[in-house]
Amino acid sequence: STPLSKAEVTMDAGAYKDITDPSVFVKFELKPKQGEDNIYSDKEKVYLLAWTTTPWTLAANTALAINKNLVYAEVKVNGENFIVARDLLEKVLVDEKHQPVKYDLLKQFDGEELVGREYKPLLGENRGKNAHKIWAEDFVSSEDGSGIVHIAPAYGEDDFNMAQKHHIPVVHVLDEKGVYTEGEWLGSLIWDVNKDIAKTLKERGIVWKIKYIKHSYPHCHRCGTKLMYRAHPSWFMDIASMRLDMLKENSDNINWFPEHIKHGRFEKNIEMAPDWNLSRDRFWASPMPVWKGVDKDGKEHIKVVGSFDELYELSGK
C-alpha cells in the first residue's frame, strides 16, 4: 500500500470514478442523563439516527457530531423513537422503496441540548475516555444525511481534526491495506465486506435503513483500486513557520518561465500550503536521514544527518 496526497489524486482527471455503494442510517442509543430518566422520552429507548456512506468505518466509531444551531426532532416510527434534524425529516423518513414512512412528532429542541450527551457503544466495545459523546461541529448541515454524523477519527479528515480538538480516541480497526485487524470481519478486505456489513447490521437492528447511492469516489491513478482515508503517523515540515521566508525567497531570488507563475500559481500555492508530509512509506523511496535515540538520562534526541561522511563519523568507527 502507498500513501497518496490529495494533489496526486486530483491531478488525474480519471482518478474519481462513479460507483454505487451502500449508505446506512445507523441507530445510536442515547444514554439517559446521569441520575434522571431520558429527558426526551420517559423510560423509552431513544436512538440518534446517523447517516454514513462508509459502513466499513462503523467499527471505529468514537463520537457523533451535530450542529448546535439546527433544530432537532424526536419522532416515533413503528414503535421506535428516533432523533433527526427537523429539516431533514421528510428526506430521511422514507422506506427503501422511497415511500413516505408514517411517524408521530414527539418533541422539537435545539441541537445545543444534545451537546455533551453520551450514547452506548455501537458494537458493544467501549473505546475509552472521552469516547461515545456528542459534539457540536459546523461541518454538520441540513443539506443531506440526518443532521447527525458518525465520527471515526482514523478514517476521515474532518473526523480526525475533530478528534484532535476534543481529545477523542483515534481507533484503528484496519491495517494499511484495508484489512480488518479485529472484530467480526477479522482478515477481510473492506471492499469485499462493505455490503455485507450493512446487511448484517440491518438484520441485527443496528442499521435502520440501507440506501444505495451513486457517488464519485477516489481511485489510485496507477493501479485503479479504491483509496481509503487512514490516519498514519508521519513526519511533516512545518510550513507555517517558514511561509514568509519562502514567499520572500520566491519573490527576490527565483526567476520563473513563464513569468506569471511567480506571483500567480506558485505564490498562491505557498500562501495556502498546509504542512508538507515528508514521509510516505513507499517501498521504492529513499530512507529519511533522521535518527532518534535516548541518552542515559532518558532524554530523547533527534539528529538529522546531512551526509554519509557525517553518518560515518557519528557511528564512532
Residue ranges and their predicted role:
Residues T2, W56, L70, D87-L88, ...:
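Alpha-helix/helix-capping structural signal
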Residues A63, L70-I148, E157:
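Protease-associated
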Residues A65-N67, G293:
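Short beta-strand-to-turn element immediately C-terminal to the catalytic PLP-Schiff-base lysine
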Residues V75-E90, G178-T181, L186-I190, E310:
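Molybdopterin (Moco) oxidoreductase catalytic core of the xanthine/aldehyde oxidoreductase family
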